[in-house]
Amino acid sequence: MISQINNEERDYKLEAYDYLLDPSLIASKPSAIRHASRLMIVRNSFLEEDCLTNKFTNNLLDEFREGDLVVVNNTKVMKARLKVELENKKLVELLVLERSHECVWLCLAKPAKKLKINRKLKLKSPLEQEINLIVDGVDEETGGRFIKFPENITCLNSMNELLDKYGEIPLPPYIKNSEEDSFHEKSYQTEYATNPGAVAAPTAGLHLSKSLISNLKKKGVIILPITLHVGYGTFKPIDQEDLSNLKLHKEWVSVNKEVVNEIKRIKKTDRKIIAIGTTSVRALESCYSHEINDFIPIAKYVNLVIKPGYKFKVVDGLLTNFHLPKSSLLLLVSAMIGRERLLELYKKAIKEKFRFFSYGDAMYISPDSLLEKK
């Protein structure tokens, strides 16, 4: 009993989500064929074969059943990384996160210390006219800067048009290679990315090729989209050791009526709801209303924290990547199958040379492997 209590206490300590990873296992480019990445299949821990490591993403065709609902995140990564010039001609890098008000947008800056309030910036491109920006304020939560853009940049559509002309795809810092930007503009997007607004890819979806999606549909698997614009809440490093009161930065989520109606229908059958990626999990779980004990369509900012102890209302299974140590994504997956089991599976993945992080291999958490739901 004391051991169980100690384990539960460790579930809420950040250091309990750390692990050692050989840097050579960090993928710098994706699999040449999306559905050819390696796949670890996680089953019920009481089964003799509770973990399969000799599979590929294309084997998901054998895992999903006719009538199962597979939910994908259709957000599209914007070219949200901008290089701006100071008065002294030195460059500063901005990562556009979200609109604050009017034409003012919250951006992460590198190096941020150079961007004092009212400092003027210039946005340049060889083929476009110069644009003047100004530092409008400092955000205490993120350490970012509020940047005033031209007066017409007041919505996601107008910002996306500007970013298409001046910006670059914001790859994670651990992806280091000599590929051209055009390579990542395709490879760092899912095949179904149609809704611009993300500053990072929902990477589990990178494993789904057009042919795999087509074959799943032919089998009778239902595939529907939600939207969660991946932002600071997904990739921000956790900076507190005590996770009991953890808060995440808000992100925009949209789950429409068609998806909600399908959730309600599926829950009355023996079919399962499979989320493609942790962002799809958070979007789906956010559409459950505790007030009315039912599922509802939503279109709003959400900062749902899923960690050990969370009881899943919607999701039965998950396709996900292998995530960074001490990340909120590790907490979410631990809530599904338990922290200790997850870390043991990561040890196994490392031993068998699975590739990690955004361009890496995948893990499928099957419905029978989840901890008890309520």
Curated annotation (Swiss-Prot):
The keyword Oxidoreductase does not apply. GO terms for biological process: queuosine biosynthetic process; tRNA wobble guanine modification. It catalyses: 7-aminomethyl-7-carbaguanosine(34) in tRNA + S-adenosyl-L-methionine = epoxyqueuosine(34) in tRNA + adenine + L-methionine + 2 H(+). InterPro entries: QueA (IPR003699), QueA_dom1 (IPR042118), QueA_dom2 (IPR042119), QueA_sf (IPR036100). Its EC number is 2.4.99.17. It is an enzyme of class 2 (transferase). Its main location: cytoplasm. It is found in: Cytoplasm. The keyword Repressor does not apply. SUPFAM superfamilies: QueA-like. GO terms for cellular component: cytoplasm. Monomer. This is S-adenosylmethionine:tRNA ribosyltransferase-isomerase. It comes from Prochlorococcus marinus (strain AS9601). The gene is queA.
